[in-house]
Amino acid sequence: STLADGSTDVTTGSFHTQSRLIPFKFGDGQEYVLVVEPADTTISTQAKIHVYYTGSRVAVLTNGVDGNSFNITTSNIADIRVAQTFDVMIMVEETMPPLQIVRGTSHTDWAVSDLNFDFYPMVNFSFATTLTPSAKTGTGINLTLSDGNYTWIQDNFPNGHVGAHVRLNAGLCKITSINSDSVTAVADVIEDLADTVASTGNEWELTAFSNFDSTIGGGYPRSISFHQNRLIFGGSRDKPQTIFASQSGDFFNFKPTTRVVSGSDTTGEVTDDAGFVFTIASDELNIIKHFVSQQALFIFT
């Protein structure tokens, strides 16, 4: 029902006992309540998001129905964090890809899916494996692993390395295929490499968020905020003390450089509005669990 102050009163008795109520404010007079209901294998129910507006349910989003996809369960719903800008709300939790809930052109038009990054953040996972490129420019170059036990996974990103980005020797590559030995990846150069020397395991970087297990390096962020015109993620599974910031004014682009073409050279330059990654240095492990954006970004561990 709609209360005297214009707020929405939602009766939750018919929902799963672990359901979450989350406000979604698109603008004045356009306030919604999202009832997020987790999947529960013990009673064979799917995850659902119920959308309420002025006291009435105007939409129901069900995982696996009408293109909606969200892996919200009884085991992770309590740890979900959200941030919203205009008609998009983003949900994060360390075991699932970031989700985007989008309000369309009307009160009843809603969709939920994995967040579509223009460019994922990148990070070094301190692999004990050297990576050597076969060329500085071009398509179809080889990226060969040695001196360690890291291997390429022959599957499409985020389940495998095909489609993932690799940063090494001041350049950027995108993997297009994996050889059968899982030691050599074939890649296209996006930004020219400075040279073809071997890059040690603590130097080359890989796409930060993925379904890879901890032996490979990946996971998803625990915390989220919009701050000073950037989208901020924090505390991923395998980088629990790290902050990932998007480019300024380009929320879904975490690229740390701007692509510059000069003649036959294509390079990446670091600019003030570029994305960045920052890891908190401390004498003990402090997992980033929450952000509050005010004049400064407050980080809670």
Give residue spans per PLM region.
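Repetitive beta-strand solenoid architecture
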Residues: F15, Q30, T45, T85, ...
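Autoprocessing Asn-cyclization modules and mimics
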Residues: V10, A59, R103, W110-E203
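Nucleic acid-processing catalytic cores of prokaryotic defense/repair systems
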Residues: F26, E31-V60
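Structural motif
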Residues: D40-Y52, P97-V102, K239-S248
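Short beta-strand elements that form the blades of beta-propeller/WD-repeat-like
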Residues: Q30-T42, D87-E93, L231-G235, K289-T301
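Beta-propeller and closely related beta-pinwheel folds
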Residues: T2-F24, A59-T73, F119, E203-T301
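Beta-strand-rich solenoidal segments
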Residues: Y53-T130, L172, V189-I190
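Acidic glycine-/aspartate-rich tracts in secreted/extracellular proteins
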Residues: E94-M96, D181, E191-L193, R237-K239
